[in-house]
Swiss-Prot record:
Gene Ontology biological-process entries: translation
Protein name according to UniProt: Small ribosomal subunit protein uS9
GO molecular function annotations of the record: RNA binding; structural constituent of ribosome
Listed SUPFAM superfamilies: Ribosomal protein S5 domain 2-like
Pfam families with a match to the protein in the record: Ribosomal_S9
Cross-referenced HAMAP family: Ribosomal_uS9_B (MF_00532_B)
UniProt family annotation: Belongs to the universal ribosomal protein uS9 family.
Keyword annotations from UniProtKB, A to Z: Ribonucleoprotein, Ribosomal protein
Annotated Gene Ontology cellular component terms: cytosolic small ribosomal subunit
Length: 130
């Protein structure tokens, strides 16, 4: 018998996460590794768990994630977005809960580009009066 799976794609900064929710005991596997080993910071691990905690489904699904691009923060945000979208497909009644928690909104903030004549995006070279 084919197992029920729910898919969701999440994005944040330059990271893209393809998330698969499978009914199970609550394990989170990111790129073939356990998420405690993949994400070194406890705060970012909490970010990844936010949608499951908000919908009270923490032990109900195994989360299988393929994520690439960006750093730890971007990847954690992308995974959170992907899990939220997959949960929405699993049960549309979660929409209000996830929306109120702000978990369905794609965080549009990106790194600002460096401009010519400047040291960074906005940092100007040191000014010398004489």
């Amino acid at each position: 018998m084919a197992q029920v799976q729910y898919y969701g794609t999440g994005r944040r900064k330059s990271s893209v996460a393809r998330v698969r929710l499978v009914p199970g005991e609550g394990r989170v596997i990111i790129n073939g590794r356990d998420f405690e080993n993949y994400i070194p910071f406890a705060a970012l691990r909490e970010v990844v768990k936010q949608p499951l905690v908000a919908t009270e489904t923490l032990g109900n699904y195994n989360v299988l994630v393929n994520v690439n691009g960006g750093g730890y923060t971007g990847q954690a945000g992308a995974i959170r977005h992907g899990i939220s979208r997959a949960l929405l497909k699993a049960d549309p009644e979660y929409r209000l809960t996830l929306k109120r928690a702000g978990l369905l909104t794609r965080d549009a903030r990106m790194k600002e580009r460096k401009k010519y004549g400047l040291k960074g995006a906005r940092r100007a070279p040191q000014f010398s009066k004489r």
